Amino acid sequence: MNQKIIYSSALLVGLGSPQAFAHTEKAHTPQKPNIIFIMCDDMGYGDLGCYGQPYISTPNIDNMAREGMRFTQAYAGSPVSAPSRASLMTGQHTGHCEVRGNKEYWTQASTVMYGDNKEFSVVGQHPYDPEHVILPEIMKDNGYTTGMFGKWAGGYEGSASTPDKRGIDEYYGYICQFQAHLYYPNFLNRYSPSLGDTGVVRVVMEENIKYPMYGPDYHKRTQYSADLIHQKAMEWIEKQDGEQPFFGIFTYTLPHAELVQPEDSILNHYKTQFADDKAFGGQKGSRYNAITHVHAQFAGMITRLDYYVGEVLKKLEEKGFDENTIVIFTSDNGPHEEGGADPTFFGRDGKLRGLKRQCYE
C-alpha cells in the first residue's frame, strides 16, 4: 500500500494517499479523494501502542501512525460524547453549538417490550439544528455518496435530525447513544433505500431478545452490535464502484462500556495475559451487567477495534481505492471508568491529564 498516512495523536488520527489530491484522470482535473472517518468511543490518548500503551496490541493503528502524520495538537470539541460529535458534524465550538450535553429524549411510554425484556424507551439525543448544515450534507452537495455506521447521537427517532434527513445515503447502528450501552442490544437502526427503507427503521435482534437484558443469561445473546456494524461498513465499501467519490463515517462504539465481547481468540488471549484480573459486580440502575476479567475485556475491545481498522484498510486496497482515499482515525473524548473500566491500570490518558467528562489542556 503506497500511501502516506495522516495519523493524529490524542484525538485525531488518519491515513491518506500521497496521490489523494494529485492523481488525475484528465490534465488539470483533480480526482476527488474518497474519505473514511473512523471515530471510536471513549478511547484515551494512552490506549494505543503508538502512544506508549504497553499491554494492548494495536498493530494496524500503530502502522498508520508510523507511516503517516499524527495531529498532536488536535483536540475533541467536548469531553463527552454527543457535544463532541456535534462539534465535528457542525464545525461549531461547543459554546455556539445546539448540542450542549447528552440530553435524552423519551417516548410518552417510559418502557417498551422486546420479548420478555422491558426496555427503556429512550429514542435519541438533542437534534442538530436543522438550519445549520452538517458535514455529510456538505459532502453530498459536493458529489459524494455517503454512509454512516455506528453511533449517531445527533437527534432522536422521528425528529428532523436523523441520518436519512441529514445527508446520509446509508446508515446502520444506534440512533440513540443510550441504547449503545448494550453490545447485545434488543434492536439496531437502519436506513437503506435499497432495502425499501423510506426513513430510519428499527431492526429487532431476534436472537438476542430470547434472553434477558440483565443477569448471567444476558451473555447467551449472540448478536454483537460492534461486529454487525463493522460488517455493514465493509459491505458498503465493497459496493463502491469508483464512479462516485465516497465519504464514510464509521463511529464504532468500542471501547465504551459495557465491557463485553464474544468469547473468541482475542478475548482469550488477554484472559491469559491478565491471569490475575479484576471483576465488576454490576451497577444498579445502569445497563452494565456483572463481568469477570475486566482488564481482558477492555484490552480485547481495543484490539478488536484495531482489527476492524485493519480490515477497512485491506478492503480499500483490494478495491483499488488505497491510492486515492484519506482515512482518519480519532476518538470522541478521553478514557472512561464506567462499567468496571480501570483506566489507571492502563496508564489513564498517557501524558495528558484527566478522563472523560474532565476539561484539561
PLM regions and their residue ranges:
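Active-site-proximal cap/lid insertion segments
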Residues: 27-33, 40-55, 72, 100-104, ...
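Conserved beta-strand elements of the Class I
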Residues: 36, 145-147, 248
